[in-house]
Curated annotation (Swiss-Prot):
Monomer. This is GTPase Obg. Transmembrane segments: none annotated. Residues 1-159 form the Obg domain. GO terms for molecular function: GTP binding; GTPase activity; magnesium ion binding.
């Protein structure tokens, strides 16, 4: 299925049905009084996040979504039927913008989360509501209200814990296929990856995290060169970025460190130009393709010194898996710690956080022994 992460749609909710002016007409009841019913509510349009959907391709072709109008009221105090609602299913991680103002209206980042895109119009009132002690035969009624109408831009930002960053052919797809069940296309030419790939890394039956692989960045990506800039938004929700650097060289006479450092600096600069906040995310350095390097320890030391890197660094081979287990467990421990911090922050905001004082321990007394 083709990956589509942007779409513009128009949603038109249904108009409410009109109320009616009607009077009771029965034999031997000459003055039956008003009995006009209300109009039905117009259909609303909702969006619900569905984890079983991973693309907005359905909205690329179905751009207009219109709900039906409510039925008009009738005599004998009969209310018009409400129109059925429309529910649009979108991927988890979809951001809904107002297409005209650019305002962010909704961010659906939880499975099952439901929002109202356009509310249906309220039905009009029948003349039964206008009866009073001084007006026993009202002829007033109100029309139904118009439903909401909006132009919306849907933008998908995939939900992942870890984002892979690097030049084309840095080994990102090889790494994600090594550590997860994702099977992206892998080949020895640039831009093999044409859309984001997600892989679930499971370290135990109860512990896992999600990795996102996007097309590689090239110099000038922030200005539209290559494909990577189209998908950098998918790294916005990640907790940590893995910057993959190819430290091998096809030319045995060339110094691979010099070109690797130059390429790594270009990636960081493109990241800063695209989004300074994204550039400030925690970033780990991953030196890849060490199976093609005679002295990995020396390469790591020389690269970090030349690059001026003091953060976390890992040396791996995505091809044979060397060093990947250490990377996986380090990521899992880091992500678990970050999630605990976020939970504590949320609990404090909700007022439900209970501080545990290590000076006080709770112990259970031994049960009393039976009588002799």
């Amino acid at each position: 299925m083709k990956f589509v992460d942007e779409a513009t749609i128009e949603v038109i909710a249904g108009k409410g049905g009109n109320g009616v002016a009607s009077f009771r007409r029965e034999k031997f009841i000459p003055r039956g009084g008003p009995d006009g019913g209300d109009g039905g509510r117009g259909g609303s349009i909702f969006a619900v996040a569905d984890r079983n959907i991973n693309t907005l391709i359905d909205f690329r072709y179905a751009r207009l979504h219109r709900a039906k109008n409510g039925e008009n009221g009738r005599g004998s105090d009969q209310y018009g039927a409400a129109a059925p609602d429309i529910t649009l299913r979108v991927p988890v991680g979809t951001v809904v913008h107002d297409a005209d103002t650019g305002e962010v209206l909704f961010d659906l980042n939880r499975h099952g989360e439901t929002v109202t895109l356009a509310a249906g119009g309220q039905g009009g009132m029948g003349n039964i509501h206008f009866k009073s002690s001084v007006n026993r035969a009202p002829r007033q009624w109100t029309p139904g209200k118009e439903g909401e109408q909006r132009r919306l831009r849907l933008e998908l930002k995939v939900l992942a814990d870890v984002g892979l960053l690097g030049l084309p052919n840095a080994g990102k797809s090889t790494l994600i296929s090594r550590i997860s069940n994702a099977r992206p296309k892998i080949a020895d030419y640039p831009f093999t990856t044409l859309h984001p790939n997600l892989g679930v890394v499971r370290t135990s039956p109860s512990r896992s995290f999600v990795v996102a692989d996007i097309p590689g960045l090239i110099e000038g990506a922030s200005e539209g060169a290559g494909l990577g800039h189209l998908f950098l938004r998918h790294l916005a929700r990640t907790r940590v970025l893995l910057h993959l650097v190819d430290v091998s060289s096809p030319d045995p006479d060339a110094d691979p460190i010099e070109s690797a450092v130059e390429n790594a600096r270009a990636i960081v600069e493109e990241l800063r130009r695209y989004d300074p906040e994204l550039a400030e995310k925690p970033r780990w350095l991953v030196l890849n393709k060490l199976d093609m390097v005679p002295d990995p320890a020396s390469v790591q030391q020389r690269f970090c010194e030349a690059f001026g890197w003091t953060g976390p660094v890992f040396c791996i081979s995505g091809l044979n898996g060397e060093g990947t287990q250490e990377l996986i467990w380090a990521l899992q421990d880091y992500l678990d710690a970050e999630k605990r911090k976020e939970q504590i922050t949320q609990d404090k905001a909700d007022g439900s956080y209970v501080h545990e004082d290590p000076r006080f321990d709770t112990t259970r007394d031994a049960p009393p022994s039976g009588k002799d």
